[in-house]
Amino acid sequence: APFAYTQNHHEQIFKALFAVQNAKVESRQKAAQIMREYLHEEMVIQFLMKSFTQGRWLFNVDALFNHYSDILHWDTIQPCSKETLFIRGGGSAYISTTEHFTAIEQQFPKAKIQVVADAGHWLHAEKTQQVVDQIKEYLN
């Protein structure tokens, strides 16, 4: 949501990513095994493993960690007059409160909010086809 978050919900993910990076493992199997020491959702592990190849992460873990507060931050913007799609997981705490809906409505007055009922925050990984279908429907 276009909303500043104050809590770090990804601390264990960062611990897992750094553990793999520091172990200097080459294989995806060993990397996933290390991640399981920190993470208990296999779907999250497998999603993150898509970005691990030849013994390294395809994204900059250090930069993400060092700038995590910037990622959580959001400056309220002037209303955007463009039609905008937000897709949320029905089981996610993101885009779930009156405060979130109000922030979206104020900044994106033409927003459409879709829900993928049986998905959490990682809906793009959990219910990929449903997310793709909703995006296609919106764009058509």
Task: Enumerate the predicted regions with their spans.
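Conserved alpha/beta-hydrolase catalytic His-Asp/Glu region
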Residues: 22-78
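Short, solvent-exposed coil/turn elements at secondary-structure transition points
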Residues: 23, 90, 117-119
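Flexible "cap/lid" loop of the alpha/beta hydrolase fold
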Residues: 1-27
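Catalytic active-site module of serine/aspartate enzymes centered on a nucleophile-bearing elbow/loop
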Residues: 109-140
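Alpha-helical elements of Rossmann-like donor-binding domains used by nucleotide-donor carbohydrate transfer enzymes
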Residues: 16, 30, 34, 63-66, ...
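Conserved strand-to-helix beginnings and helix N-cap segments that scaffold or border functional pockets
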Residues: 7-10, 97-98, 125-129
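Conserved serine/cysteine hydrolase catalytic core
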Residues: 54-108, 112-115
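Short, solvent-exposed loop/turn segments at secondary-structure junctions
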Residues: 2-3, 91-93, 120-121
